[in-house]
UniProtKB/Swiss-Prot annotation:
Residues 177-183 are annotated as: RNA binding. Belongs to the orthohepadnavirus core antigen family. A motif (Bipartite nuclear localization signal) lies at residues 158-175. Self assembles to form an icosahedral capsid. Most capsids appear to be large particles with an icosahedral symmetry of T=4 and consist of 240 copies of capsid protein, though a fraction forms smaller T=3 particles consisting of 180 capsid proteins. Entering capsids are transported along microtubules to the nucleus. Phosphorylation of the capsid is thought to induce exposure of nuclear localization signal in the C-terminal portion of the capsid protein that allows binding to the nuclear pore complex via the importin (karyopherin-) alpha and beta. It comes from Hepatitis B virus genotype D subtype ayw (isolate France/Tiollais/1979). This is Capsid protein.
Amino acid sequence: MDIDPYKEFGATVELLSFLPSDFFPSVRDLLDTASALYREALESPEHCSPHHTALRQAILCWGELMTLATWVGVNLEDPASRDLVVSYVNTNMGLKFRQLLWFHISCLTFGRETVIEYLVSFGVWIRTPPAYRPPNAPILSTLPETTVVRRRGRSPRRRTPSPRRRRSQSPRRRRSQSRESQC
């Protein structure tokens, strides 16, 4: 079976694979971040969101994997075999967990649409030859908070901006009213 854990969230394993493996923080740092930001929601019996559910499952699976790793470490007597198992877990499974934890924590922190736009932007940036791309990669935290991803189809008609009108010297509204309307 070929199961993509990101599909229902609008992303794919391939989209996350554009990010280099050293991009993702350690599992310990990601678990600490999830705990600091979302402990109450993760421990709650209430359903919060699909991202919370996925994060809960990833955290539980990581715990089980660490239990297995401890068992292997205690019961596998050959040091070379033990090192191979630990290396495999850290390299392959560790990266998958780091990607999964990062994705769901980022979606909860920045919003799913922003994270997906970031992944697409980074994917475009990394595939563009160095001579033709900006020197710095996109950064997730600097993307606008209200990013609009346009659907394919008719593009909206562009309007030319109207010339600015000169303001009269006598204000029509009192200042206190204009401040209230900005909320």
